[in-house]
């Protein structure tokens, strides 16, 4: 999934998150969009772009999507990759993302 940055939208206050990979490397990401999917899938989703992302030759930036469930205390839980074969989840994410981009 990519995000075209050749449009106007205000980045008033960026929400940032640090992800740590299996090797312990930290990468800073900007939260592009959160999606409430609890009713349909029992979890929420977040779309991230690297905080210092450079646009490619087409003016696009790579987007990463993850799911998460809230902990019992109301805090956000760990991010989980979305299974590639979960077509219903990916279709919902794409639909919400496309609506977001039209705004």
Swiss-Prot record:
Pfam families: DUF1292 (PF06949)
Family matches, as InterPro entries: UPF0473
NCBIfam families according to UniProt: PRK13678.1-2, PRK13678.1-4
UniProt similarity note: Belongs to the UPF0473 family.
Listed name of the protein: UPF0473 protein SSA_2239
Species this chain originates from: Streptococcus sanguinis (strain SK36)
